[in-house]
Swiss-Prot record:
Keyword Transferase: yes
Upper taxonomic lineage: Eukaryota, Amoebozoa, Evosea, Eumycetozoa, Dictyostelia
Location of the Protein kinase domain: 174-432
Tagged with keyword Transferase: yes
GO biological process: signal transduction
PANTHER family, sorted: DUAL SPECIFICITY PROTEIN KINASE SHKB (PTHR44329:SF243), SERINE/THREONINE-PROTEIN KINASE TNNI3K-RELATED (PTHR44329)
Name of the protein this chain belongs to: Dual specificity protein kinase shkB
Record-level GO cellular component terms: cytoplasm; membrane
InterPro entries registered for this protein in UniProt: Kinase-like_dom_sf, Prot_kinase_dom, Protein_kinase_ATP_BS, Ser-Thr/Tyr_kinase_cat_dom, Ser/Thr_kinase_AS, Ser/Thr_Kinases-Pseudokinases, SH2, SH2_dom_sf
Catalysed reaction equations from the record: L-seryl-[protein] + ATP = O-phospho-L-seryl-[protein] + ADP + H(+); L-threonyl-[protein] + ATP = O-phospho-L-threonyl-[protein] + ADP + H(+)
Spans annotated as Disordered: 112-133
Gene behind the chain: shkB
Enzyme nomenclature, EC number: 2.7.11.1
Principal place of residence: membrane
Length: 653
């Protein structure tokens, strides 16, 4: 080609690179705006964020105008090249002209910005698959090298599927006052469709561009294909342009994000056990999603919803993308919420499903610590990139986390995607189930027992438990259900209104009556503690005070302290005041009063040797352990229900 064409091609290269830089700049601004919006929503004084948001929008408008001007210039250059090519054409079948035109089509849309060779026939093949188109979706910008909708061959089927799930706008009834949540896309309301209570995700825009409609249909098509107990159930959609809505099952407890704010003394508080179970359900949902060749790309507590039984489901697939089965190619672009983004996503590098694994690690840390990721360390998007990508900073892992949990977090948020485990690996290796056992059962032998017989179970029937536990302890047929030691153990482990042994109660009880090093010694210890006069096990200080009210001076109760492994003696002193004295057990030394100097081999010995100094006289007579002891000594039948003393409920032990 002549020099003029070469110069034009060089100008196209430069302008294309400038357009790409503007798009990247826009992406960063869009993500920074989203971060500021999140901060403003949670801030009591959002004025500062509002000012910064307005500034960023102004800068974005300037960049968009500049980008439009550059694209117009590009079009003029293309027109000039085509005109020159046609002028240069000497023969109808000139192959050099055909080759140049084909190359021009590639360079116009899929160009290698680092290629300084002006020979238009020399294009880097690795860049021939890049498509630098941008789409704003739900307030996040995405740049794709792979279509965010299903392949062309399935478009018709997708359209048919959308029609099949169509819900007429007149069938949708919702109350604007019953808002469940909101975001850049619009709002979610509680409503009724065909007589069923549902959640309705309603887009609040009134004018929709073609891209918005395509992305909406993509989300509908994707959700219609997903059926798993840990993925939010899609029930239909309204595709009327003026009333775009997605209908899903209603999740009564709302999002994990909102539940993270629950107070410790409420029923919705996320304990260690609940946090790990939420993580397990998330992994199960994400394993299914990735096996379906779909990446979520916005995994965070706000997109995990909880039903009335604490079953967790992954939700909000507005940013999700298909990935070709068995493809080694990676995707390009940025999507999601910055605080949960993987390093490669933050700097717009190629990525795969491991970005979801990184997001999972951040939300798992948040579940367990109840703190915002990075603890507000970064106030802007550039600061976040500098800290997470360049300095490789991660949230601080508390020392008290079980070793396996620390290891899982470190692996999942590894800087290098190839080192992160897949969701399938986490699920198959039962990593979270093992972490649950590690965190709830401190006794190593007891951990081994639960892992051997009940891996993956949070509660088991008493009849199954006692058979396997007896075998594990070395007893085959020597223990009878009528044995008082077995009955004492059941009183410790099984609530009066249940017949189930839970993993957390089993672990907690072992801190008081363990260790489980020798089966016979363990059952002997259970008997020696439970048969002590005045023993009331897991009675709270509040309930102990109620039991002792109106009793004689010196009446006492022996109970488990709220501090696992410690005991408390609650008694009525001579001034009719309720005193709670803590007793600490030290392995190998015995029992000692808090602040005392003498250790005793048994609790009974401690009480017998210190009753005068404490001013205790008579044990409280009542409760199931006292009733069982009396029944055993008199050969009378034991009525467990009648042995319980009704008191006002108390949450603390």
């Amino acid at each position: 080609m002549n020099d003029k064409i070469s110069k034009l091609e060089s100008s196209i290269l430069q302008l294309t690179e400038e357009v790409k830089q503007l798009e990247s700049k826009q992406a960063s601004k869009e993500l920074e705006i989203r971060t500021l919006v999140d901060n403003a929503i949670n801030s009591q004084n959002p004025a500062q964020e509002r000012e910064l948001i307005n500034k960023l929008f102004t800068e974005s408008l300037i960049d968009l105008k500049l980008k439009a001007e550059k694209i117009q210039t590009l079009e003029r250059y293309r027109q000039e090249i085509i005109t020159n090519l046609l002028v240069e054409q000497k023969q109808p079948n000139d192959t050099s002209i055909i080759s140049a035109w084909e190359q021009l089509k590639i360079s116009s849309f899929r160009i290698n910005p680092n290629n300084n060779n002006n020979n238009s026939n020399n294009t880097n093949s690795s860049d021939s698959n890049q498509n630098y188109s941008s789409v704003i979706l739900n307030g996040s910008l995405t740049e794709d090298s792979t279509s965010t909708i299903s392949p062309d061959s399935t478009k018709n089927r997708d359209e048919e599927e959308i029609i099949r799930w169509e819900i007429d706008r007149n069938e949708i009834s919702y109350n604007r006052e019953a808002k469940l949540g909101s975001g850049a896309f619009g709002s979610v309301y509680k409503g009724i469709v065909r007589g069923k209570e549902v959640a309705i995700k309603k887009l609040t825009q009134t004018v929709f561009e073609e891209n918005t409609m395509n992305e909406f249909k993509k989300e509908v098509s994707l959700m219609a294909k997903l059926r798993n107990p840990h993925l939010l159930l899609f029930m239909g959609a309204c595709t009327a342009p003026e009333d775009l809505s997605i209908v899903t099952e209603l999740m009564p407890k709302g999002s994990v994000h909102s539940l993270l704010r629950a107070k410790e003394d409420t029923s919705d508080f996320i304990t260690f056990k609940r946090a790990i179970l939420i993580a397990r359900d998330t992994v199960l949902g994400m394993t299914w999603l990735h096996a379906s060749n779909i990446l979520h790309l916005d995994l965070k507590p706000a997109n995990l919803l909880v039903d009335q039984n604490w079953v967790v489901k992954v939700a909000d697939f507005g940013l999700s993308k298909y990935m070709k089965p068995d493809s080694k190619d990676k995707l390009l672009g940025q999507a999601g919420s910055p605080l949960y983004m993987a390093p490669e996503m933050l700097v717009n590098q190629p990525y795969d499903g491991k970005v979801d694994v990184f997001s999972f690690s951040i939300l798992l840390w948040e579940l367990l610590t109840k703190q915002e990721p990075y603890n507000k360390l970064y106030s802007s998007y550039p600061q976040l990139v500098e800290g997470v990508v360049n300095k490789k900073n991660r949230p601080i892992i508390p020392d008290y986390f079980p070793t396996r949990l620390k290891d899982l977090l470190a692996r999942c948020w590894d800087h290098y995607p190839s080192r992160r485990p897949s969701f399938a690996e986490i699920s198959k290796q039962r990593i979270l189930e093992t972490i649950l056992i590690d965190g709830l059962i401190l006794d190593s032998s007891a951990r081994q027992f639960w892992s051997q017989y009940y891996m993956g179970k949070e509660e088991v029937p008493w009849n199954s438990f006692i058979v396997n536990f007896s075998l594990y302890c070395g007893f085959e047929s020597n223990l009878s259900a009528d044995d008082i030691k077995i009955k004492f153990l059941k009183l410790l482990l099984v609530p009066v209104d249940s017949d189930m042994v839970t993993i957390d109660n089993f672990g907690k009880i072992l801190t008081w009556v363990g260790p489980l090093t020798n089966g016979r010694e363990f059952f002997d210890k259970v008997y020696s503690i439970c048969s002590i006069k005045g023993f009331m096990a897991a009675t709270s200080s509040k309930n102990a005070s109620q039991y002792l009210a109106g009793k004689k001076t010196g009446t006492y109760i022996l109970r488990f302290s709220s501090d696992p492994g410690s005991y408390a003696i609650s008694y009525l002193n001579k001034n009719k005041e309720i005193i709670h004295a803590r007793v600490i057990y030290k392995q190998g030394s015995g029992y000692i009063h808090h602040g005392g100097q003498t250790h005793y081999a048994t609790l009974d010995d401690l009480i017998k040797n210190t009753f005068k100094s404490l001013g205790i006289k008579e044990p409280f007579e009542g409760g199931p352990f006292h009733a069982l002891t009396v029944a055993a000594s008199s050969s009378k039948p034991f009525n467990i229900a009648g042995a319980y003393i009704p008191v006002a409920p108390s949450k603390k032990i």
